Curated annotation (Swiss-Prot):
Keyword Transferase in record: yes
Stored SUPFAM superfamilies: PLP-dependent transferases
Binding site for pyridoxal 5'-phosphate: G110, F111, S185, D210, D211, A212, H213, T240, L241, S242, K243
GO biological process: biosynthetic process
An example Gene Ontology molecular-function term: pyridoxal phosphate binding
Similarity annotation: Belongs to the class-II pyridoxal-phosphate-dependent aminotransferase family.
Cofactor: pyridoxal 5'-phosphate
PTM sites of type N6-(pyridoxal phosphate)lysine: K243
Residues engaged in binding substrate: H135, T357
Name listed for the protein in its UniProt record: Putative pyridoxal phosphate-dependent acyltransferase
The organism of origin for this protein: Staphylococcus aureus (strain MRSA252)
InterPro entries: Aminotrans_II_pyridoxalP_BS, Aminotransferase_I/II_large, AON_synthase_class-II, AONS_Archaea/Firmicutes, PyrdxlP-dep_Trfase, PyrdxlP-dep_Trfase_major, PyrdxlP-dep_Trfase_small
EC number(s) given by UniProt: 2.3.1.-
Length: 395
């Protein structure tokens, strides 16, 4: 007899709960800033992607309100019919300047970017070399393309060179692409882009960097590709507009030829209503801020180093992070979730990250310090880590 939907859901939800893999979803009352309120209680927030504090920036709010007054609350259509507003053109021109490319295209989410761009260029006659720790949206985008997917050991340049050589010399594929995150979100390490470019040039690979956690953070704000000075060497620069930029959406930056192709062939662009006017104008304002000043970027890095130093002095394992992302690696899944709950009891909101997001036995809480945190907030968080860590015999 076939299984009912109820039986399937009950069995699998119970499994997740019994194995410490089920995450409860909290509702925030108000804005997602450095401090948040849940069920009437205030917490120091170390779990958002709001790196620069722009999600609550007054200038961005004013820009969004003004755009709503002039352009309405929605774009009204897909981009290819009559949903391309002058605001969208302004945004894409600004993004191209920001990333140092000829052109850019905006999408409704960062996830959409990878679903759109990969499948618009790669197909069943091609191969994609993909870092094993790439984001889920890259994995799904690769699957959608129907290209041969070849997993590459994480940031292992010897493995990349060997697999690139094998794929190219096999003669089986029309195109071969290498895809990597710019900054890996669970550990905070940075892709080895100079070595990747060298290998790509040796074997004629297309290069694709998803800089979701690098845009606004690396390269004085312009991203990981800019950090290494490789803007003219990377074919696809992908980024979100919801993390450091503080709003919503995503983009692809590259040559005009590439962007023209994506506007003609990428399905999320063709079949989904464009970004809302208020969001679009707020994003443009955010990007212009990053181009005009590094103040927020510098404050972010200062706060990140302060938190890392404090946690390391307590004896916590913060991994090999090269960015503001600061994991505290606990290990066992249930212990990790209990640790997160105990920190919450102490007024620090930092979510546990466990399998399948990270490998079994490497559960961690991931701290995301921002430019909006004060040193007093970070001191309070460090004190909570000390108290809970000692109570649980973790330090």
């Amino acid at each position: 007899m076939v299984q009912s939907l109820h039986e399937f859901l009950e069995e699998n939800i119970n499994y997740l709960k019994e194995n410490g893999l089920y995450n409860e979803i909290d509702t925030i009352e108000g804005a997602n800033g450095p401090e948040i309120k849940i069920n009437g209680k205030s917490y120091i927030n170390l779990s958002s992607n709001n790196y620069l504090g722009l999600a609550t920036n007054e200038d961005l709010k004013s820009a969004a309100k003004a755009a709503i007054d002039t352009h309405g609350v929605g774009a009204g259509a897909v981009r290819t019919i009559n949903g391309t507003l002058d605001l969208h053109d302004e945004l894409e021109e600004t993004l191209a300047k920001f990333k140092g490319t000829e052109a850019a295209i905006a999408y409704q989410s960062g996830f959409n970017c990878n679903m759109a761009a990969i499948s618009a260029v790669m197909n069943k006659n091609d191969a994609i070399l993909s870092d094993e720790l790439n984001h889920a949206s890259i994995i799904d985008g690769c699957r959608l393309s129907k290209a041969k997917i070849i997993r590459v050991n994480h940031s292992d340049m010897d493995d990349l060179r060997a697999k690139a050589k094998e794929a190219v010399e096999s003669g089986q594929y029309n195109k071969v692409m290498y895809i990597t995150d710019g900054v890996f979100s669970m550990d905070g390490d940075v892709a080895k882009l100079p070595e990747i470019v060298e290998i790509a040039e040796e074997f004629g690979l297309l290069t694709y960097v998803d800089d979701a956690h690098g845009s606004g953070v690396m390269g004085k704000g312009a991203g990981t590709v800019k950090h290494f000075g490789l803007q003219d060497k990377i074919d696809f620069q992908i980024g979100t507009l919801s993390k450091a930029i503080g709003v919503v959406g995503g983009y692809v930056a590259g040559t005009k030829e590439l962007i023209d192709w994506l506007k003609a062939q990428s399905r999320p662009f063709l079949f989904s209503t464009s970004l809302a006017p208020g969001d679009t104008k707020a994003i443009t304002e955010a990007v212009k801020k990053l181009m005009a000043s590094t103040e927020l970027h510098d404050k972010l890095w200062d706060n990140a180093q302060y938190l890392k130093n404090g946690l390391s002095k307590l004896g916590y394992d913060t991994g090999e992070s090269e960015t503001p992302i600061t994991p505290v690696i606990i290990g066992e899944e249930k212990t990790t979730q209990e640790f997160s709950k105990r920190l919450k009891d102490e007024g620090v909101y930092v979510k546990s990250i466990v399998f399948p997001t990270v490998p079994r036995g490497t559960g961690r809480v991931r701290n995301m310090p921002t430019a909006a945190h004060t040193k007093d907030m970070l001191d309070e968080a460090i004190a909570a880590y000390e108290k809970v860590g000692k109570e649980m015999n973790l330090i």
